[in-house]
Amino acid sequence: MSKQVVIVGGGVIGLLTALNLAADVDQVVVCDQGEVGRESSWAGGGIVSPLYPWRYSPAVTALAHWSQDFYPQLGERLFASTGIDPQVHTTGLYWLDLDDETEALAWAAREQRPLSAVDISAAYDAVPVLGPGYRHALSLAGVANL
């Protein structure tokens, strides 16, 4: 008996579900109202880091950490199996002139994340188009994007 699966929704969740099921079933069909992979996941499917992670619950933090550590491996797997480069780029992330900088640094120490205060010139060097007037910067190394 042949195993067939139909997945409704061609966003990041539907496509990853199809990818993982493909090894165990005979046929996977993905249906979407528009072009597969081009709806909301096209814009937001690569965002796995809350913009201000220290402001979120431990559950969101745990999920974000796992996802951030997993995405580079997933990108390599997708490229190897499809030949399509998902363009995972590790760029890091800067926050400028935060009101809750102390809380951010405490969160990073508690969660063992590589967030640190850096001289504002480092942010200006890394992001030359940054407008003038910023005085303080935090940098989180290792943040990737798609």
Residue ranges of predicted features:
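N-terminal Rossmann-like FAD-binding beta1-loop-alpha1 element of flavoenzymes
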Residues: 3-30
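Glycine-rich FAD pyrophosphate-binding loop
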Residues: 22-44
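Fold-independent oxyanion-binding glycine-rich loops
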Residues: 33, 51, 142-143
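FAD-binding beta-loop-beta segment adjacent to the flavin cofactor pocket
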Residues: 36-37, 125-130
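Short, flexible turn/loop "capping" segments at secondary-structure junctions
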Residues: 42, 87-88, 130-133
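Dinucleotide-binding Rossmann-like beta1-alpha1 core, especially the glycine-rich loop
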Residues: 47-126
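Conserved redox-cofactor binding core of oxidoreductases
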Residues: 92-102, 129-146
